Structures are given as C-alpha cells and as structure tokens.
Amino acid sequence: RPQHSVVPAPKATPKNTVSNQDDILYDLSTGSIDTSLFPARSWGRIQKELMYQRPELLQRGDMQGDENLRAQIAAYLGEYRGVDCTADQVVVGAGVEYLLGCLAHLFAGSTAAVENPGYSRTRAVLENNGIPCVPVEIDESGLPIRALEQSGANLCYVTPSHHFPTGVTMPAPRRAQLLAWAAAKPGRFILEDDYDSEFRFATRPLPSLQGMSGANGPVVYLTTFSKSLAPGMRIACMVLPQGLLERYQSDFSMYANTVSRYEQQTLCEFMANGYFARHIARMRLTYKRRMEAFAAALHAGLDPDLTLAGAHSGLHFLLTLPGAGGEQAMVQAAAKQGVRLKGLSEYYMQDAAHCRPDTVVAGYSGLQAEDIPAAAAALGRAWRQMSHSII
C-alpha cells in the first residue's frame, strides 16, 4: 500500500535559536517570504470567477492533477527549465514533501544518497518512509561522483541548480558525470529538486538534469510554487519517466489528488493568461534589488572581513565573519538584537566538523525593502565587537 509522507514532530528548540516569537523583529530564516508581493488581486479575481462559473470543480478530479494545469506546467518547464516532458508525465501534489512520500513507495527497498549539508526535511520524509539516507559531503561543484559511488546508494537526491544551503551550482561536466552514474546500472535514479531555480540574478540557469537525460531518462524532476507564489499555497509537481509513471498510476489509482481543484484551476488560468511569467519577472527584479541592498548595508555596517557567498541565485546567502567565535555565538548575538537566522552546521546530517566556521545562513525573502537598513544595522550591533578585526 502506498505510504504517505510523515513529517516528524518538532524537535526541542536548539540552543542557538530563539523561541520567543515576540523578540523577533527581522526573520532571516530561509522559509519566509514577503507576503505583500503575492498577486492577490489577479489571483483572487480568477478564483472568484471560477467559484461562480465552474461548479464542476467541486467534483473529484484527475489523480495526477487536472490535465489543463499539467499541460501549462509542462509547457512552462519546457520553455524555462528545458524539461522534456508531456502533460501525462506531470504529477501535481500538495508540496514536495508529499511527492517524496509517493516516491519513497515507488522506490521501496532503495537507499538514497543526499547532499551534506542539505535540506533536512527531505531526509526526514525519505527516512520516515523507509528509505535510508547516506550523507555525501559536497564540494565546490556539488555532489562528488566518486563519493556517490562509494555510498552504495541507488537513489541520489540533489539540488543542482542552487544547492541548499551553500548556493553552489553544479557545472555541466559534473551534471554529465551524475547522469552517467545513473545510467551505469539499472535501478539507479536521480531525484532532481529544482529549488529556487526561478531566482538566478547573474546568469541564466543551466538546463535541468531531466532535460539533459530526456523524457524517459533516470531522472525524477521536482519543483514547487512555494517561493514563486507562497509557502501556504501547497502546490508542487514532479515529472516521472514512463516506467515510473505506469507504476505510479497503478499503485496510486485509488488516491485523490491532494490539491484543491479551485487552486489548481486558479494556477492554470494564472499561467495561461501570462500572469505567472510576469509575476516571476517582477519577483526576480524585486529580490535582486533587495539582495543588492542588503549586501551593501551589511558591508557598510560590518567588519570588512565579512564575506557573502551564494548571492548570485536563490533567496539567501551565507555570511562568514572570521574570528567571530563560532556560529552559535553569532546566532545568539543576532537573536539579542531581534534577528532570527541559523548556523550553517544545522543543515549537516553528520560530520559538521567539516562545516565552514563562523558562518550563518541569512534569508532575505521575508524582508521588506524598508526593513533592510534596520536589519543590517541590528546585525552590525550584534557582530561588530565579535570579529578579530574590530571596526
């Protein structure tokens, strides 16, 4: 029987985070967004029209998601991410975590290699659904193929366009090596999470691994609309090669789709009428300006030794302040000034001893433009006296 993904109960608050919500003035966690950027007027108008004009949407829909939405997604992914698929290969679900739970059923008995550091929720979902995870330390090009071979895994979960949380982009030669690894033995598959691929500010993103391998290659492509629309808008999708698609359709034939049909059709109309592409373009420009403003404010108010990594893409970057006395001291000092962020070591599955010292992960997608100077000033007050090179 197919298994649902299960998210574990919240852990006790780590020592280097703040539990009192009232103390937080500036949330630099990576899951935050600026809700004022949500296209509420156009989205609401479409949804209202559907509510009154499409009563059939109250009925159960296609198990994979409504076909016209899947066609829009396939066209969008083909144009912007080079994904090679038809609408039939697209599966819509309520978040990547749910879709990973479905994949865990399809890959029962497998072992997954995961990036270290990496996205801890992915590891939790896979392991809670019976897929052991083996951490593989990334390098400057992403997940190393030799270490992947040594792991003994037949699945490989990667974020090649924008590694979370370091921001590393996997170059074309490493991508080709990864695809060769998957093709070398039957039963090997790559789970490609195209995290944050819409937000690349310096250069165009490389084509997806799925597009490089072809429609029936050994790659499952996953993406979400959480960052481009809102985290509370639980719409994600995966693209399955034909062999896996047939198993999915057989094993999940009795399952209803987990996304409201009104939400599906609203997104479909939003994409079909060009709203989505324009919204992404506006978001990309807005976040690029905020990234540049935040980086400039940090450099102006902090030690000149402060370094920023990963700012070229995604909605967060790594801040390293040599001689600060460790990431825990940095996180705690920031919390006293009302700023929430996490240390880099929190994203390690193991071997955090290899973690870059004095480094924290700072997301800026939840900051409004007018809050950037104050947030940077708060970090300046927190960290100015911590570095070995005081200004």
Regions found by a protein language model. Name each.
Residues 1-48, 253-260, 268-271, 281-286, ...:
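N-terminal basic, amphipathic alpha-helical segments
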Residues 116-125, 153, 189-190, 200, ...:
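A generic "structured core" feature
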Residues 33, 161-164, 227:
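Short glycine-rich anion-binding loops that position phosphate/pyrophosphate groups of nucleotides
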Residues 47-187, 198, 202-215, 220, ...:
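Conserved core of the PLP fold type I
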Residues 191-196, 303:
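Conserved acidic functional residues
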Residues 217-285:
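Conserved core segment of the aminotransferase class I/II
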